[in-house]
Amino acid sequence: MTQVTSRQRLSPRVRGLLGGVAAIGLLAGAAGPALADETCQSPYMAKITGEEDYVYVWTLGVEGMGDGSDKLVTVDVRKGSPTFGKAIKSVSVGGRHEAHHGGFTDDRRQFWAAGLSDSKIFIFDVASDPAAPKLVKTIDDFVEKSGGAAGPHGAYALPGRMLIPSLSNKSKTGQAALVEYSNDGTYIATHWLPTDKDPKGAKIEKTADGYGYDARILPRKNVMLTSSFTGLENYMRPFGEMAKDAEAMKKFGQTMVLWDFHARQPKQVLHVPGVPLEVRWAWGPHNNYAFTSTALTSKIWLVYEDEGGAWKAKEVADIGEPGKGMIPVDISLSADDKTLFVDTFMDGTTRVYDVSDPHKPKQILEKKIGAQLNMVSQSWDGKRLYYTSSVLSNWDKTGADNEQFLKAYAWDGKELAPRFEIDFSAEKLGRPHMMAFGAAALYTQ
């Protein structure tokens, strides 16, 4: 398959071929080239192998700040541009919906962005003018269509479809599901996570709590891996209030689920205590493993296939000083599978690990980014890193520590060198959360 760079054109015919090849890979479990720009994006998307032109930032609105609405902010990151490092466009969606995660469709023509509080999904056209996305559709019946799933957590590209993990259900507990839509926004199916009462045929290692969070796929092994967080009754509460509620703190995920992806069938429920969040599969053709981090126990975990073909999970490293409650949040694995970036919210720090031996991570750098820290996005070539600050509107810090920023760095394998930063509060934009990359050349005819 010819890889499309940011200097090349992606014609309708080529887009069709890419979609067709991806579909074949989906059905056959074939291993094709890694297809993504940020290394955590879906393998079913064409990747940017040159430099990204724009960073799209899905941003939480703040009452009394600008228009107060959630918005998609476009940041210019083109070298030599007169607006380099500046927010050049923002598209408000009207109101606050707890903007959180999102993702591109497989043809990269749309960006789907989800709201955790009211379960709305906003669909942006990023192809017509990549510098100025347009809101073209809103899905406002997610709970009804899905049969009761709530809290859509981003969107993950499948060939012609979007996979949307939920965090909750209509009763606001942690019972979660995976929901599929077609690229035109038509509901297709709901797949509920296994529980102790309804294991759905899965082998349970210790418990099946039914919580959901992330979902990531390793196509060549026909494996999907999901992680677990908490329900709406917890994630919309003020963090300090919730942390003092002993019963609330029991309502967090302790599991990861391995699925037969083609069949959408849960096969094995792994015990991963401490709230495993982001899932990052290795990219190498023989690297059958994924990393996650646990928010409440500050550990790096490895989910791997052993020599006998069995899937297992084990903790492989501490994050920061044990017992300090760093709260690991986002992670990013480099395209060569050698470097893992781990962000911790409470101390605003990113830690970089050599994971050449995935069973024995070694920390090689620790750098404070800000008073608080959440997301990290990495360019495919591993040379540029972007960081944002907000976790959830009711969980972010207050006062002087409530820094809201996008910060960009260059990475040479040893140090992170600042490139630019944007103060989202000073710009009256809001709380920046999830990032995604764009390149104008993808859509040039």
Predicted segments, located by residue:
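Beta-propeller domains
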Residues: 105, 205-351
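Asp-box/WD-like beta-propeller blade repeats and closely related beta-sheet repeat scaffolds
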Residues: 126-219
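A short beta-strand motif characteristic of beta-propeller blades
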Residues: 87-93, 134-145, 187-205, 265-270, ...
